[in-house]
Amino acid sequence: FKIKANQKTFVTGDTLHLTIQNRKNTAYDSIQFFLRGERIAVPYIVPEDALLGDIPTEAAVFIEGKEIRATSHLRLLNKTAPSLYTYTLVNEFPHDKQAYTQGLEFDGEHLYESTGLKGKSSLRRVNYKTGAIEKQIDLDATYFGEGLTLINGKIIQLTWQENTGFIYDLESMAMERSFTYDQSKEGWGLCNDGTVLYKSDGTSKIWTLEAATQKETSYIEVTTHKTILTKINELEWVKGTLYANTYQGQKDVVVIINPKNGAVDGIIDFAGLRNKVEQIQGLDVLNGIAYHPERKTFFITGKNWSKLFEVTLQKK
C-alpha cells in the first residue's frame, strides 16, 4: 500500500485528498489517515494555524482485524513570499578578529559572546564599544562552542557535535552544570522568549525546550513559500519573532521566522558588511545577531570579523 495525495505541496486553506494506491487490489475493510499522528477525515482542509514543513503522513489499512501501516510525507509551504529587508549602518565597533563567533546576546550594556573551534572555544563578556573582553571562560579543547542565551540569571551555551550544553551563573560566569541534548543531534543556535528556549541544530528544525530542564518539547521547520530552509544557525528573539542567521545561496542573510508555525516572514540581506572587515585568512560567514532593546538596534558580526556593526532594518 502507498499513500497518494492530490498535490505534491500544499498551503493552509487547501483541500487535501488522500487515497491508497493498492497495486495488488488487496481487499481491505477500512482505512484511517493520520497527519503528525492525529487522525483526520478526508477530504481535509488544511487549517490556517498548521505547522509548516514536511508533515509525517500515515495510513492505517485494516484487513480482517489486522492493521497495515503506510507512511509518507506531505509538504506544507508558506502562503506568502517573505518581505525583503535591507539595513542602515549606524555604528562600527572593534571586534576580536580571533573570535569565531557562534552566539551573541545583550544583558543591559554587557554583550555576551560564545566562540567556536576546538581549542579556541570560549564564553565571553565583552565591552561592545571598545571590543575589550571583560571576562573569558575557555572551554575544554574537546568542545566546539556554539550558540548561547541568557535567562533567569543563567547563561546557557551549546556545543556543536558533543551532545552537551553548559549552564553558567550570569554574574560570576562560573559553570554550574552540563546537560545533554534530547532528539536534536547537534547544537547550533540558541535564544529564549523569557519562558522557553529555542534551539537550532543545523537542519530545518528549531526546537522548543523547557528552560529549567532543557527538555525538547516540540519543533517548527523553517519554511518559505517555495522550500524548507536548512543550516539555521545563530538565533535571536525580538518582540515575539525569531531572527536566524543562515548562509543561503552564497549570501549572508538573516531570516525572520514566525515561532508558531515556522513561516519565513522576512529575509534581511546583509550584503556588503563582510567587505568592511579586515580580510584575514580564516574570515568566515556572518554569524552573530544581538538586539539592543534600549537602542532599538541590531548588532551584527561574523566568524573572525574585526568589526561589530550596529544597524537598523528597513523593508525594501
Regions found by a protein language model. Name each.
Residues V90-S122, Q136-T149, G302-N304:
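Beta-strand-rich domains and repeat architectures in extracellular enzymes and scaffolds
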Residues E113-L117, Q157-N163, K199-T203, A244-G249, ...:
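Conserved beta-strand positions in repeat-built beta-propeller and related beta-rich domains
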Residues T88-P94, A132-L139, A174-T180, T217-T227, ...:
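A short beta-strand motif characteristic of beta-propeller blades
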Residues T227-A263:
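Loop/turn-rich, solvent-exposed surfaces of beta-rich toroidal or solenoidal domains
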Residues V126-G131, D169-M173, E210-Q214, N258-G262, ...:
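Short loop/turn segments that connect beta-strands within beta-propeller blades
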Residues K97-G108, A141-N152, D182-G194, T227-G240, ...:
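Beta-rich, blade/repeat-based domains predominating
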Residues L77-Q98, Y128-E134:
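A short helix->beta-strand "capping" segment at the edge of beta-propeller domains
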Residues G131-Y168, M173-S184:
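Blade-loop segments of beta-propeller domains
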